[in-house]
Structure formats: C-alpha cells, structure tokens
C-alpha cells in the first residue's frame, strides 16, 4: 500500500489479479516443500495467489497483508477450505506468530517493502522476524528480483528519465486506469533507487483521478542477503537463479533461496 487513494488501491488490487497470473513460482515452492503437510506463513500474501494453492495442496496456511482490497479477494478463491486463514497486518511492525515450518517471502516482497523504516534495515528485519517465527529446523523461502539489477554485482549510480507503463486496463467495476513509473535515480553509495509511481484512472462516470506517489527501493546484492541470513541463524540449502531451477549466474537478475533455521 503506497498511501494510495481508495479508488486507486481498488483498481490496483483488481489489476494485480488480472495481470499477475503466473504459477511457476507456486509450483517451484511446492516442489521444495514436498508432500508432507506443513504449517506455513506467507508474509504479504496479497490476494492469495500463492497462499490458496498452498492450502489446496493440503498445508495449513496463514497469511497477512496490509492491503485490505487485496485481502478481500482471498475468500472467493479459498472457497470452503478450512486449512487457511488470513488477516490484515504490517510486516514490519506487527507480530508474525511462532512455530511455523516454513515462512514464505515471495512475490519479491524484499524489494517491495512499504515502511517509514530505513529500507535496508527493514529488509534485514523481515529476515530476522522470519527466523523468530519459525520452529527449529524450519525453512525460509525467498524470491528476490531487485528491479533488473544483477544480484552478483554492485550497480553504478545512474539517472534515467522517461515513463514506463506497468499496468493498463479496466477494473472489475469498469474503471479504466494506467500505472506507470517515472524516472529512476539510483545512488550507488546508499543503494537507493528513487522514482515516481503515477496513477491515472478514468471512472465510468467520466471522473478522472490522478495521483503521483514518490517511492524508493533499496538494492541489496546477493552477498548482503547471504550476510543477513547467516546473522539471523539460517543455513542456505538450495539457491537458484529463478523459479525454473536454473543456477545463479554472473548475470542473474534474481535469486530464489531456501534456507534452514539452525
């Protein structure tokens, strides 16, 4: 949630379900988990794209998210499943619970944190909170894709102008909208990328809603992720460059990590 107007948040939730339909990450996660029933927590579960399939696979799942519009979509997807629950909560400031077998940080959440906390500190905090929420021997699953940056390299400072349309379409209520990103200012010293997220929505009644939101993200290279995991008491057991099981290469722009709490 980026302090969006309610109309914008509703449009984003609808567009997420229309645009983000891949299942390869879910299938890959299920292959790592195995068939034995597990108690699983998904952090920032959104509309249940991952949470619901985990429940349908027989696992007992819990999820939370700070976006009420996304959470409202889970019920219809879950149907009569009794092994799934979810609530509204803040990943940085709220309690995650304890004694889970697996904590899932998927959907690139480590690169999409919304908080007033220092970004790198918030990234490390999520890993530490995952450790606290896990039972001894439990696992953390991380899917991390830092905005096209190669995870094995530092990134030089740069400034890009221009506009990139991310989503464009009509929501479930017939309102047409567009979400785009404007500019990109990356500081290699801080690892912070700054840009503007622009929303333009035309409602069915002709009303036009526009909102610009200043955003920033922190690029943590793979070496830093490894340090955070080690400091939190994790041992990496499996690591891949993507959810197809390919190895991490020199030019990989993402990483999937499955690490055990020791």
Q: Which residues are covered by each model-predicted region?
A:
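A short glycine-rich, Lys/Arg-flanked "PGG" loop and its adjoining helix->strand segment in the class I
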Residues: 121-136
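Class I SAM-dependent methyltransferase "Motif I" SAM/SAH-binding loop
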Residues: 44-46
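C-terminal lobe and adjacent flexible extensions of AdoMet/dcAdoMet transferase-like proteins
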Residues: 216-262
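A short acidic, Gly/Pro-enriched loop at the edge of an enzyme's catalytic core
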Residues: 93-102
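Conserved class I S-adenosyl-L-methionine
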Residues: 1-38
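A short SAM/SAH-binding and catalytic strip from SAM-dependent methyltransferases
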Residues: 101-121
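SAM-dependent methyltransferase
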Residues: 141-226
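Class I SAM-dependent methyltransferase SAM/SAH-binding core
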Residues: 51-93
């Amino acid at each position: 949630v980026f302090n969006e107007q309610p109309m914008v948040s509703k449009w984003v939730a609808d567009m997420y379900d229309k645009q983000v339909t891949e299942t390869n990450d879910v299938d890959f996660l299920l292959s790592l988990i195995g068939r034995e029933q597990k108690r699983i927590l998904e952090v920032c579960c959104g509309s249940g794209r991952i949470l619901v399939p985990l429940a349908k696979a027989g696992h007992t799942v819990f999820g939370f998210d700070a976006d009420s519009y996304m959470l409202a979509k889970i019920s219809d997807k879950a149907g009569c499943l009794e092994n799934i629950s979810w609530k509204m909560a803040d990943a940085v400031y709220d309690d995650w619970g304890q004694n889970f077998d697996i904590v899932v940080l998927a959907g690139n959440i480590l690169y999409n944190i919304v908080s007033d906390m220092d970004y790198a500190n918030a990234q490390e905090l999520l890993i530490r909170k995952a450790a606290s929420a896990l039972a001894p021997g439990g696992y953390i699953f991380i899917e991390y894709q830092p905005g096209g940056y190669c995870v094995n390299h530092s990134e030089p400072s740069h400034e890009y102008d221009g506009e990139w349309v991310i989503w464009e379409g009509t929501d479930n209520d017939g309102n047409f909208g567009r979400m785009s990103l404007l500019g990109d200012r990356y500081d290699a010293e801080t690892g912070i990328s700054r840009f503007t997220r622009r929303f333009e929505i035309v409602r069915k009644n002709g009303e036009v809603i526009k909102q610009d939101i200043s955003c920033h993200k922190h690029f943590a290279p793979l070496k830093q992720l490894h340090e955070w995991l080690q400091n939190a008491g994790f041992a990496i057991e499996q690591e891949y460059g993507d959810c197809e099981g390919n190895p991490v290469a020199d030019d990989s722009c993402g990483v999937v990590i499955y690490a055990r709490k020791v």
